[in-house]
Amino acid sequence: MIKLFVGLGNPGPEYEATRHNAGFWWIDALARDWKLNLVPERSYHGLAARTNIGGQSVWLLEPQTFMNLSGKSVGALARFFKIAPEEILVVHDELDVVPGQAKLKFGGSHAGHNGLRDIHAQLGTGDYWRLRLGIGHPGVKSEVINWVLKKPLKEQREAIEDAIVRTLHAAPALVAGEMEKATLIIHTSKPPRPKPPRREPGDGGTPATA
């Protein structure tokens, strides 16, 4: 059961549309879906909103500490409300996944992501859920920092937005703790193919109109 949805990014208008802020885009979209307003919460060093689903409090959080101090925000809220690491989902940009795809993962290393690195440190564990939104890789390691801090091309942004829309459908399953169902929704990168037109018996292959 997910009780805390965290989106990673950097605060400020100059970073708003950059690849590194894909996690913020996801939380913004979820807040719109759930008709919530993210408001500054100084105690948790971020923008936050709380709702009630099935009698359970669920939080949305966007740390405003800059990426490499994200754990300060996540840790503060999680500790105060006694939210366990396994009840946290962190949504972040992922270099090793192409735009338009997303991957749900539990645990593991921070893989060099500075936001995850600090969350690991503040929670004292890597045993929390991550939703990895693909932003693609520049192809050269030396270009990674420049890549994540730039805006994606129009078609890349559209692909990322498509992934956000699709993965938001998994939110109810994530809250309910139905992780297999959530994984199926998130990892289905394309809608199912439409069924072929129905044919009337013996019509010689012409699609039926009724």
From Swiss-Prot:
Taxonomic path: Bacteria, Pseudomonadati, Pseudomonadota, Betaproteobacteria, Burkholderiales
Catalytic activity: an N-acyl-L-alpha-aminoacyl-tRNA + H2O = an N-acyl-L-amino acid + a tRNA + H(+)
Stretch forming the signal peptide: none
Localisation: Cytoplasm
Coiled coil: none
Domain of life of the source: Bacteria
Positions bearing the site annotation: Stabilizes the basic form of H active site to accept a proton: 93
Statement: the UniProt record of this protein carries the keyword Methyltransferase: no
Active site: 20
Assigned keywords, A-Z: Cytoplasm, Hydrolase, RNA-binding, tRNA-binding
Region (Disordered) residue spans: 186-210
Gene3D superfamilies in the record: Peptidyl-tRNA hydrolase
E.C. designation(s): 3.1.1.29
Binding, tRNA: 15, 66, 68, 114
This protein's name: Peptidyl-tRNA hydrolase
Gene Ontology BP terms: protein quality control for misfolded or incompletely synthesized proteins; rescue of stalled ribosome
CDD domains assigned to the protein according to its UniProt record, in alphabetical order: PTH (cd00462)
InterPro entries attached to this UniProt entry: Pept_tRNA_hydro, Pept_tRNA_hydro_CS, Pept_tRNA_hydro_sf
